[in-house]
Amino acid sequence: MNQKEQNEHSKDFNLRSKLIGIVSITFIAAIALAVIFGGFFFGMKGLFSILGITYASNQTLALFILACFAVGLIIDPLTKIISIILAKSLSLKKTALFAFILYFISNLITICFADYFMQSIYIPDVLLVVISAFMAIIELAFDNQPNREAA
């Protein structure tokens, strides 16, 4: 085998290995996204069945979750910015209260917006408030802002 044939063979092998690498990484990323979405889907399905929320089909539930993600992509960065500004200007107790109110309102807007445009899902108003408050408590518990001494 001469040098030219070796170079062509190594280019072919190099292209093949790159293609296998790209396909493998894409496949792993798709599996990870499917597992994450499946967790959300079955979590929401269980929560909806516990709370008695009715929906027309599994596709409707999947669209509701995607709508919540889409609205959340717009609202959550604004919420984080306001939360950081409040954390710098208020004491710890006031910050926690305002952060809870801010998270509650942003969750309520997100769920109400998705619920409004999805006619095939019915969530009673009381449950909208309960779910938003529960999600706000969870967000507040997992908020990664460093705790500082109360002023």
Curated annotation (Swiss-Prot):
The gene is ymzD. One of its GO terms (cellular component) is plasma membrane. The keyword Transcription regulation does not apply. It is found in: Cell membrane. The chain crosses the membrane at residues 22-42, 62-82, 97-117, 121-141. It comes from Bacillus subtilis (strain 168). This is Uncharacterized protein YmzD. It is a multi-pass membrane protein. Signal peptide: none annotated. Keywords: Cell membrane, Membrane, Transmembrane, Transmembrane helix. Its main location: membrane.
